């Protein structure tokens, strides 16, 4: 089964993707996490991607599509949840072509609907563990010790693109480039709207009931 999580930055795609992985054994493919790993390795892809990511812009489609193609070619028949991909109509069309050649298709697209003021609060409050990747929020999901990761006591950091100036850009890019995918998948009868404004557990229950 192939699922896509679609929604504005901070709407909970990463959080729900991680739950689909831990609770239902989906392969969680987050293009954002993959790119951040390349950036911290300072690989050629990471160095290129960093220029775009720090400004809140999309990384060029050809780099992203090649990454996804590698994953699917290696293991085409797993249950996947894609988080943060596709991100524009061009990526969605390339994804469809790629899946067609493997006799696969996107089964369901979950659109996480959330108001801008909540988005901004979630993004500005997000803190992440640079060691294990765990995500926290100073407003909604505090670690036990204010500034340290619950798993390994590493000091938590703020993502560079969660700074206020970059958040504004990310929201603009989302509205211009990603939002049109809602109509794209609605037209294909694959779109399921999820109100993302509950607790993590509430949103996950809603998701499961729609699977
Ligand atoms: P990416 O990492 O994909 O960022 P994003 O889409 O902006 O999404 P986020 O990770 O910010 O938010 P999320 O929806 O996953 O929310 P989360 O669960 O973390 O992309 C980063 C960059 O990489 C892009 O700007 C671009 O440059 C590049 N990129 C990535 N994919 C690309 C692609 N396909 N094409 C081109 N470029 C690409 O939650 C956010 C916060 O809220 C957390 O603190 C969390 O604890 C909290 N939270 C979550 N759920 C709840 C809840 N129910 N209640 C209260 N708090 C909650
Ligand atoms: Zn940690």
Curated annotation (Swiss-Prot):
List the pathway annotation: Purine metabolism; AMP biosynthesis via salvage pathway; AMP from ADP: step 1/1
Q: Signal peptide position in this chain? A: none
InterPro entries membership:
Adenyl_kin_sub, Adenylat/UMP-CMP_kin, Adenylat_kinase_CS, Adenylate_kinase_lid-dom, P-loop_NTPase
Q: Which GO terms describe its cellular component?
A: cytoplasm
Amino acids binding ATP:
10-15, 126, 135-136, 198
Q: Where does this protein chiefly localize?
A: cytoplasm
- Start and end residues of each stretch annotated as LID: 125-162
Q: What chemistry does it catalyse, as a reaction equation?
A: AMP + ATP = 2 ADP
Spans through the membrane = none
Residues bound to Zn(2+) are 129, 132, 149, 152
Question: Which cysteine-cysteine pairs are annotated as disulfide bonds in the entry?
Answer: none
Which residues take part in binding AMP? 31, 36, 57-59, 84-87, 91, 159, 170
Which Gene Ontology BP terms does the record give?
AMP salvage
- Enzyme nomenclature, EC number: 2.7.4.3
Q: Which Pfam families match?
A: ADK, ADK_lid
Q: Which UniProt keywords apply?
A: ATP-binding, Cytoplasm, Kinase, Metal-binding, Nucleotide biosynthesis, Nucleotide-binding, Transferase, Zinc
User: Where in the cell does this protein reside?
Assistant: Cytoplasm
Chain positions covered by the region annotation NMP: 30-59
- What family does the Swiss-Prot or TrEMBL record give for this protein? Belongs to the adenylate kinase family.
| Classification via PANTHER family | NUCLEOTIDE KINASE
Functionally, this protein is described as follows:
Catalyzes the reversible transfer of the terminal phosphate group between ATP and AMP. Plays an important role in cellular energy homeostasis and in adenine nucleotide metabolism.
- Subunit record text: Monomer.
Domains (record comment): Consists of three domains, a large central CORE domain and two small peripheral domains, NMPbind and LID, which undergo movements during catalysis. The LID domain closes over the site of phosphoryl transfer upon ATP binding. Assembling and dissambling the active center during each catalytic cycle provides an effective means to prevent ATP hydrolysis. Some bacteria have evolved a zinc-coordinating structure that stabilizes the LID domain.
UniProt-recorded name of the protein: Adenylate kinase
């Amino acid at each position: 089964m192939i699922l896509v999580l679609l929604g504005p930055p901070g709407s909970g795609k990463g959080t729900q993707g991680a739950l689909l992985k831990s609770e239902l054994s989906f392969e969680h493919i987050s293009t954002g996490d993959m790119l951040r790993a390349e950036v911290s390795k300072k690989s050629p892809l990471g160095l290129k991607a960093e220029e775009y990511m720090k400004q809140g812009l999309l990384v060029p489609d050809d780099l992203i599509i090649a990454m996804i193609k590698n994953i699917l070619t290696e293991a085409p028949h797993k249950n996947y949840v894609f988080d943060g991909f596709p991100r524009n109509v061009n990526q969605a069309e390339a994804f469809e072509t790629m899946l067609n050649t493997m006799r696969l298709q996107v089964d369901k697209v979950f659109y996480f609907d959330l108001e801008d003021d909540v988005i901004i609060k979630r993004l500005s409050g997000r803190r992440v563990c640079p060691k294990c990747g765990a995500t926290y929020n100073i407003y909604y999901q505090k670690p036990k010790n204010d500034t340290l990761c619950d798993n390994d006591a590493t000091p938590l950091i703020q993502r560079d693109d969660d700074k206020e100036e970059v958040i504004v850009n990310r929201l603009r890019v989302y509205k211009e480039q990603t939002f049109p995918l809602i109509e794209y998948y609605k037209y294909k009868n694959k779109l399921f709207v999820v109100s993302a404004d509950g607790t993590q557990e509430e949103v996950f229950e809603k998701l499961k009931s729609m699977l």
